[in-house]
């Protein structure tokens, strides 16, 4: 089977990761101790992608939990699914990274990284045919961002031909935890551009908006936000976990989604969005799902795709869905919104189907889009970065850990390059059209 090894680093990564394991354990019919008591053969068929079968009919996640302080780990261990994980796979330091990327990447994190790699190696050796790695982390802090990117580059060195997918929580404009988020995020993106194959961008503000607007929660907790993220993660990985008519794995997804190697930052969405308690009391149809899925309000990253164009996108439908209906809907979306799709990649919507819906729903869909409007997100972080870096504010925290200002300058220019690459492809048309257009302009201008 094509296994995936999952890593979660830092507080945010561990909380999202815990929600993800809770969600998929439920989908595969596992209780909180990893014992199978499901009803469908399909739940077992590809269980081994994420779970290792231990003795006594118990399934153990292929998960490695990493943090530089013990706090979050204790919370995961004490949480509802704490007994699911293999105790040896908790790797933690004592000192914490204090929201400092340099500590996570160069000092504290670097001391712990070999211990983590040992566990990763052990998990990888337990696989028949390892497909790749997925990592959940945030880009704004110290451990998830600094140590997370360190792990990614180390794993890249050791497993150069395996896929690397990241679920990265990007700092959002309104919801900020720390002042130095722009530094940490820019330094992280600098790493992700080079070392990740696909990065799913999630941001807290967009999640808050979805909770308030669509789910009608007046005061959303992190639990509610994590629930949304885990729904998307479950959707993105459905095709890997269940048999379906049209299955894709991480590599197929990348082949279809990444036209240029650096442009692998995706926006994600999910439908139907229903609040946690009220599992929808109405029937859901494919057109409805499609409409909600392409709605800018449902994107989990704070950038509006109407300000850019889609290079590629992928839709994953779950439940009893007719292939033809899905394809018609997709064609429909593309022809209605053709201005939001680049015309130089024909058929740039890819669809996948899976027969098993998430718990409590009859059907659902997950959306993954590679849109040039994601540059808004990087632009925003870049502007905040420049504002602070120009004054060299807070730099001593980083240089004190042995970093060089040069590295900041490089990260900044790499991020600016990324933004202009997205812009370049947003403006690019098909050459012939552009030439005709230029000839027509003079007489038809006024």
UniProtKB/Swiss-Prot annotation:
Identify the domain of life.
Eukaryota
Q: Where is this region: Disordered?
A: 422-446
Major localization listed first in the record, in broad terms: cytoplasm
Q: Where does Mg(2+) bind?
A: 69
Cellular component GO terms held in the UniProt record:
cytoplasm; microtubule
Q: Which Pfam families match?
A: Tubulin, Tubulin_C
Query: Where does the protein end up?
Result: Cytoplasm, Cytoskeleton
Keywords of this entry: Cytoplasm, Cytoskeleton, GTP-binding, Magnesium, Metal-binding, Microtubule, Nucleotide-binding
Supply one GO BP term: microtubule-based process
Q: Where does GTP bind?
A: 11, 69, 138, 142-144, 204, 226
A GO MF annotation of the entry reads: GTPase activity
Biased segments, Acidic residues type: 429-446
Q: Could you say which cofactors this protein requires? A: Mg(2+)
Please describe the quaternary structure of this protein. Answer: Dimer of alpha and beta chains. A typical microtubule is a hollow water-filled tube with an outer diameter of 25 nm and an inner diameter of 15 nM. Alpha-beta heterodimers associate head-to-tail to form protofilaments running lengthwise along the microtubule wall with the beta-tubulin subunit facing the microtubule plus end conferring a structural polarity. Microtubules usually have 13 protofilaments but different protofilament numbers can be found in some organisms and specialized cells.
Similarity comment: family membership: Belongs to the tubulin family.
Protein's job: Tubulin is the major constituent of microtubules, a cylinder consisting of laterally associated linear protofilaments composed of alpha- and beta-tubulin heterodimers. Microtubules grow by the addition of GTP-tubulin dimers to the microtubule end, where a stabilizing cap forms. Below the cap, tubulin dimers are in GDP-bound state, owing to GTPase activity of alpha-tubulin.
> Which named protein is this?
Tubulin beta chain
Lineage of the species this protein comes from: Eukaryota, Fungi, Dikarya, Ascomycota, Pezizomycotina
- What is the gene called? TUB2
């Amino acid at each position: 089977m094509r296994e995936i090894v999952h890593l979660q680093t830092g507080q945010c990564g561990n909380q999202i990761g815990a929600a993800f394991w809770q969600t998929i354990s439920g989908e595969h019919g596992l209780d909180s101790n990893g014992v199978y008591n499901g009803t469908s053969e399909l739940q077992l068929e590809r269980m081994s992608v994420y779970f290792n079968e231990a003795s006594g009919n118990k399934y153990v996640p292929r998960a490695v939990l990493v943090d530089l302080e013990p706090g979050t780990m204790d919370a995961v261990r004490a949480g509802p699914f704490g007994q699911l994980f293999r105790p040896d796979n908790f790797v933690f330091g004592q000192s914490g990274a204090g929201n400092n990327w340099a500590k996570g990447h160069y000092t504290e994190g670097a001391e712990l990284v070999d211990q983590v790699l040992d566990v990763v190696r052990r998990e990888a050796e337990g696989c028949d045919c390892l497909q790749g790695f997925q990592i959940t982390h945030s880009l704004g802090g110290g451990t998830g961002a600094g140590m997370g990117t360190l792990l990614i580059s180390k794993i890249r060195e050791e497993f150069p031909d395996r896929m690397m997918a990241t679920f990265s929580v990007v700092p959002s404009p309104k919801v900020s935890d720390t002042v130095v988020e722009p530094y940490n995020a820019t330094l992280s993106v600098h790493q992700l551009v080079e070392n990740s194959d696909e990065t799913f961008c999630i941001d807290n503000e967009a999640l808050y908006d979805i909770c308030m607007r669509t789910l009608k929660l007046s005061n959303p907790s992190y639990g509610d936000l994590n629930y949304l993220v885990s729904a998307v993660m479950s959707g993105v990985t459905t095709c890997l976990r269940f048999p379906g008519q049209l299955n894709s794995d991480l590599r197929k997804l990348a082949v279809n989604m990444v036209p240029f190697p650096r442009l692998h930052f995706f926006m994600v969405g999910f439908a139907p969005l229903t609040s946690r308690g009220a599992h929808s009391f109405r029937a859901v149809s494919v057109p409805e799902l499609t409409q909600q899925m392409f709605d800018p309000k449902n994107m989990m990253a704070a950038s509006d795709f109407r300000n850019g164009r889609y290079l590629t996108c992928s839709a994953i439908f779950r439940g009893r869905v007719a292939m033809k209906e899905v394809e018609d809907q997709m064609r429909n979306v593309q022809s209605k919104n053709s201005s939001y799709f680049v015309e130089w990649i024909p058929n740039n919507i890819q669809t996948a189907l899976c027969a098993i819906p998430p718990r409590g729903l009859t059907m659902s869909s997950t959306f993954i889009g590679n849109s040039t409007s994601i540059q808004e997100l990087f632009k925003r972080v870049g502007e905040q970065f420049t504002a602070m870096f120009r004054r060299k504010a807070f730099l001593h925290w980083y240089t004190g850990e042995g970093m060089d200002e040069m590295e900041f300058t490089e990260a900044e220019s790499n991020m600016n390059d990324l933004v202009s690459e997205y812009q370049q492809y947003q403006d690019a048309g098909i050459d012939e059209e552009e030439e005709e257009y230029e000839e027509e302009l003079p007489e038809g201008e006024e």
